[in-house]
Amino acid sequence: MLLGASGAGKSTLLHLYRKAFPDAELEDRTLRPILYISLPSRVTVNDILSGLLEACGDPEPQKGTARSLLSRLYGLTKSLGVQLIIIDEIQHVLPEHTHRRTQEAADMIKSIMDRSLIPFVLAGLPHGNRILTDTVKGKHSEDQLIRRFNASVQLKPPALGSNAWKNLMAVYQKTIGVPCINLSSDEMLKRFYLASNGLHGFIANVLEHALESTDGNQQICMTHLSEAFDVSSYADLIENPFKMSLPQVERALALRANV
C-alpha cells in the first residue's frame, strides 16, 4: 500500500512510475504493463470492475454482471500483458456505516490477484489501510487480504530544517521557469513550511497561483506569494504566512510543533 495525506505526493509518484513503464504498440496488439484507476466516492465493486475494464479499453465497461465483468477483465489483462494494477483513492471503498462494501471490495481484489497472479498497489489516504484491518475478523488467515499487502509505505512530509526540505524547495526553484525569490533561504523555508506543512501539493498550488499573477518576466516576489496563498485551500485555516513578520512565522511554527 502507498498511503499519505492529501498533497503528500502520492499522485505525482504514481504518475512518474507509470511514465517509466508506458504502453507499447505492437503489430497485433497493445501492451499495457500498468493498469491504473482512481476511485470516485461511494464506489461499488461493480464500479471498480468497470473502471478496470475501461482502463483496459473495453468498449462497454459497465455492461454485464459482476461475473461477466470479471471474466472479461481476466481476458483483457492477459492480452494486454498487464504486470501491475494500481488502484488510487482506495479509501473510497470504506463505507460510513457498514463493513459489507469493504469486505466485497477486498474479496474482489483478492480474487483477481489469486487468479491473474498480477500484483496490486493500493494507494490513498492513511485511513485507507482499513480495507486490510476491517476485513480480518471472521476470515481464515489464508483468505485475509492483509496477508497479500504486508508492506506499506507511508509518505510523510520532510521536517522543517532537514536537508530533504531544503532540497525540495531548491528543486521548485530550478523548475519554476521564471525569476523567483530565493525559495531555499532560511526565511522562505519557514514561510513555506507554515503555509504547506511540508506537503508537496500545497507548495505547488501556491507557486502555480503566484506564477499566474506574473507576466512571465516579473520576478515572483512576496506579494505574489501572499496573493497566491489567499486563494489557496489553507487560506481559511491559518493567517497568511507571506504577510506575517518573520518572528510571527517562527512563533506560529513553534506553536504547531507543540500541539
Regions flagged by a language model, labelled:
Residues 44-51, 59-119, 164, 184-187, ...:
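Mid-core helix/loop region of P-loop NTP-binding domains shared across ATPases and GTPases
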Residues 1-15:
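Walker A/P-loop nucleotide-binding motif
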Residues 15-19, 204:
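The feature captures the helix immediately C-terminal to the Walker
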Residues 92, 105-183, 187:
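The catalytic "switch" region of P-loop NTPases
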Residues 19-30, 57-59:
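Post-Walker A helix-loop "phosphate-sensing" segment adjacent to the P-loop in P-loop NTPases
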Residues 143, 160-166, 171-259:
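C-terminal alpha-helical "lid" subdomain
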Residues 32-43:
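A short hydrophobic beta-strand->loop->alpha-helix junction that borders the nucleotide-binding pocket
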Residues 10-11, 44-45, 128-133:
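Switch/connector loops and helix/strand junctions flanking conserved nucleotide-binding motifs
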